[in-house]
Amino acid sequence: MTATSSQEVTRGATRHDGGRFRRFRTVTKWLLLGLVLLLTLGLAGSLINHWVKTPREESAYPPPGQMVAVNGHRMHVYAEGEGEQSLVFLAGSGTTAPALDFRGLYRRLSDDYRTVVVERAGYGWSDDSGGVSRDIETVLQETRLALREAGESPPYVLLPHSMSGLEALHWASRYPDEVAAIIGLDPATPAAYESSPPPRLKVALVTFMSRTGLLRLVPSLCDGSPSVSHLSEEDSEAYCSLMYRRTMTADVRAEIDVTQANAELVAAEGVPEVPFYAFISDGEGLIDTWNEILVSYAEAAGGQHQVLDVGHYVHSEAPDLIATEVRAFLEQLVR
């Protein structure tokens, strides 16, 4: 074969390879465009479904408690029981339906106590605050006013879950006469946030899924919640509805942004002198030192604690045990 013939063969092979590459690139481009189109249509369908269902669900599942005016917005306060001691339940960060989330526990206590759940702005049936600061002092004043407007009066036994442990400790420091005791349901203490920055990526992802209705495509998130096992079918539907449309609201995100600052303020106030009992989870899914921090705090407070072999939502996973212990603890206080 001459040099010229060899060059022609090479050019032919190159043209052939180039043609195959262009065809591959074209096919890939159309596949990607098709995928983008499918995702766009799917997202649009999810949004439309969400927009249609949301007002229907708001009408179908009205608030079971009182709506009271606080600081330019309305807050939902649910209460039952007529006992002399008032137990006030405070929800952890992102709990979408506190009035239903705590039901497994307060239904086991409301025969003997006044049980009250305050839903902070942006939670459950409460309105969004409209941009009002979520610093711990503002949140506490709103909680106190909501209780007063709902006809409740201190002193209160506070039962905070998770992040609201900070609010309970701040409350006891600022207004000791209003807090008879703190019974923490795997409550957070300031040290839990010293080296725990906000999970911004997770917050952004969950916010996107909530706003676009994509959470509705994952019903296991609701059905698998330990709280649902304590609810009727209708209340379970209301719980799921609130989860789909009230997860990661603007107020919840604002709370997360100021959590570390709130923790620093509470830490500076020291350990309040108030009867203290902490029910502590197995720590799964939390920071590695969660249990150690809580045990240390309970001991520093001169209080009691019990480590349970259950997840973070201790009040839903071990309500019988906790109700029994709450009664025994409160009976000791009045002797």
Regions found by a protein language model. Give the residues of each.
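Conserved HGGG/HGGXW glycine-rich cap/lid loop of the alpha/beta-hydrolase fold
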Residues: 73-125
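Catalytic active-site module of serine/aspartate enzymes centered on a nucleophile-bearing elbow/loop
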Residues: 300-335
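Active-site loop/turn elements of alpha/beta-hydrolase fold enzymes
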Residues: 120-123, 187, 310
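Conserved serine/cysteine hydrolase catalytic core
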Residues: 231-300, 309
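A catalytic-pocket lid/entrance helix-loop region that shapes and gates access to the active site
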Residues: 185-219
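Alpha/beta-hydrolase fold catalytic core
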Residues: 2-87, 110-113, 151, 295, ...
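Conserved hydrolase catalytic core segment
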Residues: 153-196
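Active-site loop/oxyanion-hole signature of alpha/beta-hydrolase fold enzymes
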Residues: 117-159
